[in-house]
């Protein structure tokens, strides 16, 4: 693989090399690093650590994809300014990518005099179709809700794993309260037939090794963390990630699609 960048650069202000945030596991409580994301539109999200260095004007974000001769040609796709109130200067969502194409990213810190830092590490990801969420939405009276969706996918990019994430809107930090990761056992239902998966209480705390699940857990569950009781009355939101490609060495997802958040209330 050949990586092609631009010409040598000036760094008279000694700008700091940006550090990419390492990618989290799909079932971790906090979603970090490069990933699929849906905010008004689906895209690939990259994250880097914030820095209070003096003299920085903006971050330049570069993107590349493989060409027919296996070279990766990078071009600058955007600038993220320190004073841009519409953007978080440590997160960028790229909504201009094509589905099923592997994209590579790195960033540089640019000083007010035009000097540039060295390039950050390069990260990569593939965006797939977003699942279509059906329920639960609005108000329900079930403390063990059934999650239903359509698995939108394409040939050669079938979903192999799913991750459901629930957050309690009445908590200030909006951390996940329940996460379940499970194998796809519904091959052949893609794009048309609804898939259902019922909530069950977790048996493990966050980050614990967990190989024993609740008696109500389906047989295809890989992991489940968080809430160890039924959903109480309150306001929640949930989303679904469909994963098609996982790195066999580190277990990290490398290709996925993610639904937008859907909101529901539990009232008995």
Where are the regions that the model predicts?
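Intrinsically disordered, phosphorylation-rich cytoplasmic tails of plasma-membrane receptors
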Residues: 6-9, 41, 70, 159, ...
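C-terminal motif of bacterial Sec signal peptides marking the signal peptidase cleavage site
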Residues: 2-4
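Recognizes extended acidic, P/S/T-rich segments that occur
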Residues: 50, 58-98, 161-231
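Membrane-topology and secretion signals of cell-surface/extracellular proteins
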Residues: 22-27, 37, 42, 48, ...
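Pro/Thr/Ser/Gly-rich low-complexity, intrinsically disordered linker/stalk tracts
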Residues: 7-55, 99, 114-156, 251-268
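Short coil/turn motifs at secondary-structure junctions
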Residues: 53, 66, 112, 154, ...
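Beta-strand-rich modules
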Residues: 92-116, 228-250
């Amino acid at each position: 693989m050949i990586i092609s960048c631009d010409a040598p650069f000036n760094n008279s202000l000694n700008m700091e090399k940006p550090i990419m945030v390492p990618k989290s596991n799909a079932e971790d409580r906090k979603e970090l690093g490069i990933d699929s994301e849906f905010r008004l539109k689906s895209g690939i999200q990259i994250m880097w650590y914030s820095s209070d260095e003096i003299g920085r004007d903006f971050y330049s974000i570069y993107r590349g994809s493989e060409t027919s001769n296996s070279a990766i040609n990078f071009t600058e796709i955007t600038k993220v300014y320190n004073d841009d109130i519409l953007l978080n200067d440590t997160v960028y969502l790229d909504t201009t990518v094509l589905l099923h194409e592997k994209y590579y990213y790195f960033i540089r810190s640019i000083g007010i005099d035009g000097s540039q830092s060295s390039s950050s590490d390069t990260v990569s990801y593939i965006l797939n179709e977003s699942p279509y969420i059906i329920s639960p939405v609005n108000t329900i009276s079930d403390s063990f809700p059934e999650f239903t969706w359509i698995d939108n996918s394409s040939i050669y990019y079938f979903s192999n794993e799913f991750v459901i994430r629930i957050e309690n809107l009445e908590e200030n930090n909006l951390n996940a309260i329940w996460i379940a990761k499970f194998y796809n056992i519904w091959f052949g239902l893609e794009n048309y037939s609804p898939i259902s998966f019922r909530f069950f209480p977790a048996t493990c705390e966050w980050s614990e090794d967990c190989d024993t699940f609740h008696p109500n857990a389906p047989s295809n569950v890989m992991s489940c963390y968080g809430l160890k009781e039924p959903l109480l009355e309150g306001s929640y939101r949930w989303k679904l990630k469909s994963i098609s490609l996982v790195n066999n060495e580190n277990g990290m997802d490398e290709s996925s699609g993610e639904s937008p958040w859907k909101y529901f209330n539990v009232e008995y």
